[in-house]
């Protein structure tokens, strides 16, 4: 614990490494994102990380969480960044803060606010007057929140990042210097650093004078550190993101990495004298609509709700094998750990819940949204919306015996209805797909419901506007004159439920459950297809029969003693019950995305961890022929098209030797 009146902390560097208050210091840190953890559980998760032996925690700052609309800022409750940092400091932990403004993080739009994209001419992450004006206005608010927490003022913040992995995107040094100078001018006096993949191209694009150069990688520690030493000839070697785990896209297996292998690399880094940030220490959850997405040039790849990341502290606070092995290694290098982890929070007993209320989304449109009128079907951002669904309606003229309906610039997934009947599904990965339409003499009402499945958070396709970007055509004729209804679905209190079942199409379904003592639980939806779940008004996240995720984590603080309400928005066909589980494992075995059967739970591919179909790429992303004998070993790829902005990857060939960089191949996703 820190004293009630702590002394200033200084983190500096000399030729050999870090100095903390003048003494040699090795940073052993764990990443935890406050915006992925319920605030009532911040202390629990931080205590678990402290018990693993780390002396520091690291967090990104998600701009879009704090400024959901231009000029409207929130730093209360789940957005109380200062409270999170103070709490870490009270537990005796130093804090590294990475304010971006771009953070990647598998978070919607890499943490940038969606409203930036309302201006179709804005240019992101470079010296663009409109973008920099928004960033400067944000930093004018953010830095005063963080300044009192700096180590020089007795707070726990010892270092801050400048942008994030910028060399994987661009090389505008003037932009990075603008961010650096902006932090300094606003009073940030702690150590500053940039971080990029441990490849020459990345480092050349992302480093700037006067700022510590650090790396991100998950394999080949000796080679990675050697590359880092080229760009940081003296001073500390730092792996700001040690990728011991990985995130998941819908339709993939859950990614895991052998704990012994992950521990061996951590041991190698610490033995080399490097400072390390374990990414992630605790992954948490992409609650609500906040998940990010990748794009590999051919396939859009949205992330699942869980951000478990195969971390040492699991999504619900579990202490995994990695936790215990990492603790042993950290203890060996830095000394005994003085703290033990708290007991695992209690969990609710399993039960099956019947539905007691239903209402269709179409019948609720006017209760959930205010209608806008536009000539063209504008994007979400142009309609003043960032997250959720958006509904478009127009009147088609008839008679038209046969026509093909196309959506130009769809992002991401559209259900199409003619006079209230669903006629098909369109997705962004099939931009040339069309639906056959017959319009009767009197015309027909066309409804299009589009889901934003998560903005791309990495690569050249970052400007990922949602909804309908260009237009809707019948054959070659664009349709004009649209009613547009933004559906952020952040308040469902106006819904009017009835007992009459709604068995098909987008609809809300309700169940009520009595709870004696609030506790953690997992929500399973057997027989349901795709949608979103709310608990007592809080959006838990998306579900999708595609997997790999089969349950949603419902933290104990969201429950209350007495009556609790679960609302499920099902976009297609609902199940008949909702299951409360005491484990993330579903009640029954589900088909894997490939059609094979797999054991229940989310560690579905332990025999071949990270096997997602890879090929190698050199430093410039040029892929040689694929080799079918390799499985992924330790990866972190955020994809882009027209340029391969791959980060450092490691593969293990079946003979056990490591290979060079790689990138994930396109993975087609069925419905």
Model-derived segments and spans:
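N-terminal carbohydrate-binding accessory modules
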Residues: 1-56
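The substrate-binding groove and active-site-proximal loops of carbohydrate-active enzymes
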Residues: 27-38, 63-79, 117-137, 161-172, ...
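Aromatic-lined substrate-binding rim segments of carbohydrate-active enzymes
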Residues: 43-107, 180, 184
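Aromatic- and acidic-residue-enriched segments that line the glycan-binding/catalytic groove
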Residues: 71-77, 101-125, 176, 210-213, ...
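An active-site-proximal structural segment forming one wall of the substrate-binding cleft
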Residues: 81-91, 95-97, 121-156
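Active-site neighborhood of glycoside hydrolase catalytic domains
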Residues: 133-208
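Catalytic-core region of carbohydrate-active enzymes that cleave or remodel glycosidic bonds
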Residues: 218-314, 318, 329
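Aromatic-lined ligand-binding clefts that engage carbohydrates, nucleic acids, or primary amines
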Residues: 402-417, 446, 513-536, 543-544, ...
């Amino acid at each position: 614990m820190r004293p009630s009146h702590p002394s200033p902390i200084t983190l500096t560097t000399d030729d050999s490494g870090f100095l903390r208050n003048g003494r040699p210091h090795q940073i052993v840190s764990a990443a935890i994102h406050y915006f992925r953890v319920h605030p009532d559980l911040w202390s629990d998760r931080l205590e678990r990380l402290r018990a693993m032996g780390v002396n520091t925690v690291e967090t990104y700052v998600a701009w879009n969480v704090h400024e959901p609309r231009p000029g409207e800022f929130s730093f209360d409750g789940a957005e109380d960044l200062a409270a999170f940092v103070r709490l870490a400091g009270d537990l005796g932990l130093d804090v590294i803060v990475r304010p971006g403004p771009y953070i990647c993080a598998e978070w919607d739009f890499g943490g940038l606010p969606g409203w930036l994209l309302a201006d179709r001419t804005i240019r992101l992450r470079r010296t663009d007057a409109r973008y920099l004006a928004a960033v400067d206005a944000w930093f004018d608010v953010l830095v005063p929140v963080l300044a009192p927490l700096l180590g020089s003022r007795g707070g726990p913040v010892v270092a801050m990042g400048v942008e994030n992995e910028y060399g994987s995107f661009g090389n505008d040094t003037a932009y990075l210097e603008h961010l650096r100078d902006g932090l300094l001018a606003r009073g940030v006096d702690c150590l500053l650093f940039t971080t990029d993949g441990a490849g020459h191209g990345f480092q050349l694009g992302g480093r700037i004078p006067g700022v510590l150069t650090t790396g991100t990688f998950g394999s080949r520690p000796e080679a990675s550190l050697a590359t880092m030493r080229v760009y940081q000839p003296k001073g500390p070697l730092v792996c700001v993101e040690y990728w011991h785990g990985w995130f998941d896209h819908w339709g993939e297996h859950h990614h895991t990495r052998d704990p012994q292998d992950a521990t061996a690399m951590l041991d190698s880094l610490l033995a080399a004298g490097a400072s390390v940030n374990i990414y992630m220490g605790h992954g948490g959850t992409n609650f609500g609509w906040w998940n990010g997405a990748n794009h590999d040039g051919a396939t859009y790849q949205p992330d699942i709700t869980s951000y478990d990341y195969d971390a040492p502290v699991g999504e619900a606070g579990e202490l995994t094998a990695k936790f215990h092995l990492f603790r042993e290694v950290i203890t060996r290098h830095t000394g005994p750990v003085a703290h033990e982890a708290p007991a695992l929070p209690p969990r609710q007993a399993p039960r099956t819940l019947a539905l007691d209320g239903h209402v269709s989304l179409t019948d609720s449109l006017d209760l959930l949204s205010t209608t806008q009128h536009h000539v063209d079907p504008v994007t979400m951002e142009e309609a003043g919306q960032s997250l959720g669904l958006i509904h478009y309606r127009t009147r088609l003229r008839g008679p038209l015996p046969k026509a093909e309906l196309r959506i130009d610039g769809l992002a991401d997934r559209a259900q199409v209805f003619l006079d209230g009947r669903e006629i098909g599904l369109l997705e962004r990965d099939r931009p040339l797909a069309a639906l056959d339409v017959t319009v009767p003499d009197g015309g027909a009402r066309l409804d299009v419901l589009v889901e934003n499945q998560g903005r791309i958070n990495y690569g050249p396709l970052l400007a990922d506007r949602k909804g309908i970007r260009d237009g809707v055509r019948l054959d070659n004729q664009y349709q004009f004159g649209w009613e547009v209804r933004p559906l952020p679905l952040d308040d469902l209190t106006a819904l009017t439920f009835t007992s009459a079942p709604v068995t098909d199409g987008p609809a809300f379904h309700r169940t009520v459950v009595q709870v004696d003592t609030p506790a953690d639980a997992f929500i399973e939806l057997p027989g349901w297809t795709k949608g979103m779940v709310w608990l007592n008004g809080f959006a838990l996240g998306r579900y999708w029969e595609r997997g790999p995720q089969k349950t949603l984590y419902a933290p104990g603080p969201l429950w209350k003693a007495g009556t609790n309400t679960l609302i499920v928005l099902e976009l297609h066909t609902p199940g008949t019950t909702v299951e409360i589980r005491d484990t993330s494992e579903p009640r029954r075995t589900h088909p894997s995305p490939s059609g094979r059967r797999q054991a229940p739970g989310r560690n579905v591919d332990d025999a071949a961890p990270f096997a997602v179909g890879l090929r190698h790429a050199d430093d410039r992303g040029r892929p040689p022929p694929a080799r079918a004998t390799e499985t992924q070993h330790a990866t972190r790829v955020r994809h882009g098209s027209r340029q391969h902005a791959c980060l450092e990857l490691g593969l293990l060939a079946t003979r056990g030797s490591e290979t060079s960089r790689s990138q994930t191949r396109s993975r087609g996703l069925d419905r």
